[in-house]
């Protein structure tokens, strides 16, 4: 699932927090140009998310395990791989205002100068 950790920009020295991963019912993508966050609800993804769940070997997470197992048992659509799923999700999200694209793999960036050169700090929280 998701996590949050403190960071300091190696370029400008700005201190900030980075959130990655997402949650029980949404994904968290970042802009590949400025680092801005974008949440994408599983409900808004509709059938493509159900196809992804269908292809998993187990539930997506503990919080949705009953739902996920039911989808895996009863959903009639074809399963989709994680790679295919990520491509579809990224294609459905609008471009960032800065002109960049929201992706699952974008590195954390400083919110002040947008540098990807960040130093991971000691404060860390896992969201499972």
Residue ranges and their predicted role:
Residues 20-28, 101-109, 124-128:
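Short linker/helix segments within small regulatory modules
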Residues 2-5, 20-22, 37, 41-92, ...:
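Short, intrinsically disordered terminal segments enriched in charged and Pro/Gly residues
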Residues 77-78, 93-95, 99-102, 110, ...:
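Low-complexity intrinsically disordered segments
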Residues 15-17, 37-40, 100-103, 116-118:
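Cys/His-rich microdomains that often coordinate metals
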Residues 1-21, 28-31:
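General detector of N-terminal leader/presequence modules that precede the first folded domain
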């Amino acid at each position: 699932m998701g996590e949050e950790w403190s960071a300091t920009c190696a370029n400008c020295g700005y201190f900030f927090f980075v959130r990655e991963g997402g949650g029980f019912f949404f994904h968290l993508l970042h802009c590949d140009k400025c680092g801005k966050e974008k949440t994408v609800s599983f409900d808004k993804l509709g059938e493509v998310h159900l196809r992804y769940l269908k292809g998993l070997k187990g539930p997506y997470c503990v919080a949705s395990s009953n739902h996920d197992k039911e989808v895996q048992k009863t959903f009639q659509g074809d399963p989709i791989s994680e790679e295919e799923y990520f491509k579809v999700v990224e294609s459905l999200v609008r471009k960032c205002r800065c002109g960049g694209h929201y992706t699952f793999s974008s590195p954390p960036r400083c919110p002040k100068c947008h540098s990807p050169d960040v130093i991971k700090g000691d404060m860390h929280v896992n969201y499972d």
